[in-house]
Curated annotation (Swiss-Prot):
Name of the protein described by the UniProt record: Pyruvate dehydrogenase E1 component subunit beta
Binding partners and assembly: Heterodimer of an alpha and a beta chain.
Gene assigned in the entry: pdhB
Subcellular localization(s) per the UniProt record: Plastid, Chloroplast
Pfam families in alphabetical order: Transket_pyr, Transketolase_C
Keywords attached to this entry: Chloroplast, Metal-binding, Oxidoreductase, Plastid, Potassium, Pyruvate, Thiamine pyrophosphate
GO cellular component: chloroplast
Signal peptide (UniProt feature, chain positions): none
Binding site for thiamine diphosphate: E60
Reactions performed catalytically: N(6)-[(R)-lipoyl]-L-lysyl-[protein] + pyruvate + H(+) = N(6)-[(R)-S(8)-acetyldihydrolipoyl]-L-lysyl-[protein] + CO2
Length: 325
């Protein structure tokens, strides 16, 4: 066992897959000799050379399209978006090419591409660098989406994503890169379609992912002290949802709270709430509540920035409200 930071876990997983499979390559802005904006690819330029680690111009549409073409012709590219907000510049390539080409080619092409990078509200990164784009890509047919929240699942997810023949977006949160965890030296994978039951409980199901997992766990300390027994599930897979794990919890607790950093209007929480209502309505004893970020651009001011995202005290209040009714 060795203590590893989340960005180091991503690096380990990526390195293991590049060592295992010579078809795996990385491209993006500053991923080469600089080592990536958050040092996930540090040392890779010397280890793998310029053919497998490609520094690109600042042109997301161009290098994302190039990566999709590389995937169509047999490579397994990993694209690093320096910031998830910049992927809007490549939305056409991701939506109309990566997501659809397997279908529109009649199955003649697979697109084994991984698109990864940091997003979410950081510390005064400003509106354009604090984007949460999960729901933008959720509606694209053919894409899979996962979100890491710990060093353990970050490493396992990136390895599984690289081995998949589907186009996958791996969402990483900018504030979690320095999160520490002891990881075993043995190889492991994390299922791309499976939610994680972080804490079993009986009173209420709390569904969350990414950074909000840690806000929920912080709130849970106070909730347990007050006598509540929440079940916490990190949904991990943002598309498709693991309705088996989620449904089993809903049928047990009969109450659901969704906690996300995505925007309230059209966010992941809204889609997840609709899915639960469709499949498990008869098991609910109360309305599903969803705590989401405010529908505003993220302010630069630190106090205002904090007000736009969900805090542990808000989670405590809503759990008490649901459990007392």
């Amino acid at each position: 066992m060795a203590e590893v930071l989340l960005f180091e876990a991503l690096r380990q997983g990526l390195q293991e897959e590049m060592d295992r499979d010579p078809r795996v390559m990385v491209m993006g802005e500053d991923v080469g000799h600089y080592g990536g904006s958050y040092k996930v690819t540090k040392g890779f330029a010397e280890r793998y050379g310029d053919l497998r680690l490609l520094d690109t111009p600042i042109a997301e549409n161009s290098f994302t399209g190039m990566a999709i073409g590389a995937a169509m012709t047999g490579l397994r590219p990993v694209v690093e978006g320096m910031n998830m907000g910049f992927l809007l510049l490549a939305f056409n390539q991701i939506a109309n090419n990566a997501g659809m080409l397997h279908y529109t080619s009649g199955g003649n092409f697979t697109i084994p591409i991984v698109i990864r990078g940091p997003g979410g509200v950081g510390r005064q990164l400003g509106a354009e660098h604090s984007q949460r784009l999960e729901s933008y890509f959720q509606s694209v047919p053919g894409l899979q989406m996962v979100a890491c929240s710990t060093p353990y699942n970050a490493k396992g997810l990136i390895k599984s994503a690289i081995r998949s023949d589907n186009p996958i977006i791996l969402f990483e949160h900018v504030l979690l890169y320095n999160l520490k965890e002891d990881l075993a030296e043995e190889e492991y994978l994390v299922c791309l379609e499976k939610a994680e039951v972080v804490r079993p409980g009986n009173d209420i199901t709390i569904l969350t992912y990414s950074r909000m997992r840690h806000n929920v766990l912080q709130a849970t300390k106070s909730l347990v002290y007050k006598g509540y027994d929440p079940e916490i599930i990190d949904i991990v897979s943002l598309k498709p949802f693991d309705l088996g794990t989620i449904g089993a919890s809903v049928c047990k607790t009969h109450k659901v709270l969704i906690v996300e950093e995505c925007m309230r209007t059209g966010g992941i929480g809204a889609t997840l709430r609709a899915a639960i209502m469709e499949h498990f309505f008869d098991y609910l004893d109360a309305p599903i509540l969803c705590l989401s970020s405010q529908d505003v651009p993220t302010p630069y001011s630190s106090p205002l920035e904090e007000l736009t995202v969900i805090q542990p005290n808000q989670i405590i209040q809503v759990v008490e409200q649901l459990c007392e009714n």
